[in-house]
Amino acid sequence: MLPPDPLHPLRPFLKNFVWEHGHIGTRYINCVTGEISFDDGKKSRFAAEKYLYVPLDKDATDDPLVTGPATQDAALARFLRAAQLGKPEEAGSAAEVQRAVHDCLDLAIFSAYQHDALQAVDHYTQEAMFDDEIRAALVDDIRRVYTPMREQLALYDFTVLHGLPTPLLFSDSPFIDWRVRVKPAMPFVSLPLGPYALLIGTPSGRTSRAAPVAWKTAVSMGVLKDHNRLMAERARLWIVATSDDQLIAIQDRFKKDDA
């Protein structure tokens, strides 16, 4: 009996982008080739890249055999579905929603540091270092940057914006830090939960645990109008969308010259 397919860390989010009317599957663009494709079924087979996991807790023991952050999958799936449907009453209790948002952030940061992790491995493998030394150096590099970020975000206030008028793109690097990605800087971070739902984090000013998650219906994109552009700019491997038109609009960014 074959072992089950390994689950991509972002698979819980990708489920909200599966087209389930008639031909079931996901529309995506390959950022390496610029090819637009339709992935049949619900497995998101195009999202097959390997992840390097680094535990970000300061005192956490690094175990290379651990493949990702611990998440409560059932509660996370319920929260993501409720966000996409715009039904907070179906998201679970306040505590369950807070835990789901915590899991979302851990997965978002997990995806955010993959490029840095791969670059670090490429760099250290060219040095005269043993495998365990390479791993230790990688862990130090990632923790130096992303542990403070994770601690800061743990104190943010979070809002689920649902019913967005424009469908969102979702990529292999879906977390957007608007504090550094746009000028002038905007004081929030975001993560798509589905085509029409977005998790927004803003500074709370508190030094203890953040407040309960808020839910708001979006009446316009407002300052989020650049979301899809920023998503396309940071993508390295793939981008999913709800329509081919969305992907065609960004295809020139990824098309390779024939010459």
What positions do the PLM features span?
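Alpha-helical structural context detector biased toward long hydrophobic helices
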Residues: 1-259
